[in-house]
Amino acid sequence: MFNQHSVEIDWGGRPLKLETGKIARQADGAVVATYGETVVLATVVAAKSPREGVDFLPLTVDYQEKTYAAGRIPGGYFKREGRPTEKETLVSRLIDRPVRPLFADGWRNETQVIVTVLSHDMENDPDILAMVAASAALTLSGAPFKGPIGAARVGFINDEYVLNPTLDEIVDTQLDLVVAGTADAVLMVESEAKELSEEIMLKAVMFGHRHFQPVIDAIIELAEKAAKEPRELKVIDDTEIEKEMLGLVEQDLRAAYAIPVKQDRYAAVGKVKEKALAHFFPEGQEPKYDKLRVAGVFKELEAKIVRWNILDTGKRIDGRDVKTVRNIVAEAGVLPRAHGSALFTRGETQAMVVTTLGTGEDEQYIDSLAGTYKETFLLHYNFPPYSVGETGRLGGAKRREIGHGKLAWRAIRPVLPPHHEFPYTIRVVSEITESNGSSSMASVCGASLSLMDAGVPLKRPTAGIAMGLILEGERYAVLSDILGDEDHLGDMDFKVAGTEAGITSLQMDIKIAGITEEIMKVALGQAKDGRIHILGEMSKALDRARAELGEHAPRIETFKIPTDKIREVIGTGGKVIREIVEKTGAKVNIEDDGTVKVASSDGESIKAAIKWIKSIASDPEVGEIYEGTVVKVMEFGAFVNFFGAKDGLVHISQLAAGRVQKTSDVVKEGAKVKVKLLGFDDRGKTRLSMKVVDQETGEDLEAKQKAEGDAPREAAGE
């Protein structure tokens, strides 16, 4: 019934198994990949005919985690998986980025890759396995995919590189780097690092590339057994159109791409395109070529013009040389009510970045396959359509916004103070108000300034820069601080963020084969120079965190109480803690280990809440004097609330000096009194006294009398 094939190898000390032919047999390609006890299913389906009216590759990649994979039931009312989580979105992008450049030019068939996590062993992150499985499924599918690719995670622990570190090991690593590529070249890198050098980062990339070669060999072996016949792809020769187009608009395009202002340049390019279309599609005549083909050739010619100019003259679209960074204006404290804010402008790219400090109540609960955990640092990136002079629909965060936000998050997180030293929940929002390339790196720069403006003690300021590459045969040019056009028309998008001490985040997407280690080394060195320059410009606005938190930010005081007192502080059904919050106006968060965090923008509120909590969580001391309130008057004395929720009895004989006939002659309910704790009776009841305390001054009369009585004897002894 089943025509099964499988390949198994040892990879990083664990077995990797790739199987096909049993599950999802109606898909064009389907592979079940197992690593340890983590299992994923990758499927590929490609439409039988091209999609009409498109000039791009209609590829969709969806990665999904099923909670049953970890033996759990989803939370929420409906108890089933809902919209994609951030992790699912990020892994979908992680798979998409290295496979997209490997489809044959001209492939316009709808293609969908779906990767489903079926089992998770809590040791091996499914993301790398998902990339491997997707590569294998594409290789088997018959689609014109020039793979396979391999992928690996690289850690750096105790100054040694570690292949595919487990989830436990990744906690201690200085580097979390994912690299993917073919047998010959690296195509994609995504990483977070603790201020590591360019040399360590580059060696990590090459380490990963070497160590995923056995995976590529295994996929090829499986394909030799089970791959489908390659789909036929008609390659259309556009040489005639190219010649005609070049003679018609080359000089006009060169002139248009010499205009430095983006909107003016786009307008000029638009007029050149209109000229070309009018030539190829004259009114009243039957067109000689398909409109999409002509538009595609025009787009390719745009890329060639930009690339030729850079390689031939060393001059870029806006007149810069390959190493120059655009003009920078950095400002901090631009919003009056925000806890921290910054406006970072680099050429025609601008980010308004705002920091908000919150308390434990503001932590984000993340429900992942590995379990639920709390995130105390959030960074959100928004890219509204007006930032590029367009109209569009506003809605939830798109995949690109989630990916760019995570990249900036990775760049900033390594320089944040430990949570036990700075116990705030931190939310940073980057609003891209203008964009012409490298908006994610502008977000990193703005986030660093905004956090320091809020008083967050960063280890060091952090900056980011986007690098590009033009490669033609043996000639190449590495570009610093690329424009949007240089990103679209170039061969590489290489984003590097970090401090003066080292790299904190690196992301690389390469569109062609042939990027050598030497080219990457040049790009990293040039990126370091650019990063140091940008940090210098940022320091003109702010070079370190402000000494005080923002005026409107909450203050947090942290202390500990005995764990056996937590229940008393919270009270039945949270009654006590709610009363403390309502009456003091402070926010209170109590953790399982007895750590208490009290937060408010008002210092008096914090003091009142702390005093109240400590009075509940600690015991009164015998011989100490306390201020209290009479809560009940009885014939035999008065009950006084004197220590948080604790009450004690002032016996009628302890109300005042001399004989007291009636308790109500001395005190009334609600009266404020001063009492001394005498001790506890046989039943543990509290005994208090008013008569030994001066009700005006709170002075201990017994101690005063004793001191006065001892004074003459001491004098006589002398």
UniProtKB/Swiss-Prot annotation:
InterPro entries (alphabetical): ExoRNase_PH_dom1, ExoRNase_PH_dom2, ExoRNase_PH_dom2_sf, KH_dom, KH_dom_type_1, KH_dom_type_1_sf, NA-bd_OB-fold, PNPase
Binding site residues for Mg(2+): 487, 493
Entry EC no(s): 2.7.7.8
Cellular localization per UniProt: Cytoplasm
Domain KH stretches: 554-613
Keywords: Cytoplasm, Magnesium, Metal-binding, Nucleotidyltransferase, RNA-binding, Transferase
GO CC entries: cytosol
Primary location recorded for the protein, binned into one broad class: cytoplasm
Signal peptide (from-to): none
Protein family per UniProt: Belongs to the polyribonucleotide nucleotidyltransferase family.
Region Disordered, residue ranges: 692-718
SUPFAM superfamilies, sorted: Eukaryotic type KH-domain (KH-domain type I) (SSF54791), Nucleic acid-binding proteins (SSF50249), Polynucleotide phosphorylase/guanosine pentaphosphate synthase (PNPase/GPSI), domain 3 (SSF46915), Ribonuclease PH domain 2-like (SSF55666), Ribosomal protein S5 domain 2-like (SSF54211)
Keyword Nucleotidyltransferase: yes
PROSITE patterns: KH_TYPE_1, S1
GO biological process: mRNA catabolic process; RNA processing
Claim: Manganese is one of the keywords in the record: no
Domain S1 motif: 623-691
HAMAP family listed in its UniProt record: PNPase
Task performed by this protein: Involved in mRNA degradation. Catalyzes the phosphorolysis of single-stranded polyribonucleotides processively in the 3'- to 5'-direction.
Name of the protein this chain belongs to: Polyribonucleotide nucleotidyltransferase
Cofactor(s) demanded: Mg(2+)
Biased composition (Basic and acidic residues): 701-718
Example GO molecular function: 3'-5'-RNA exonuclease activity
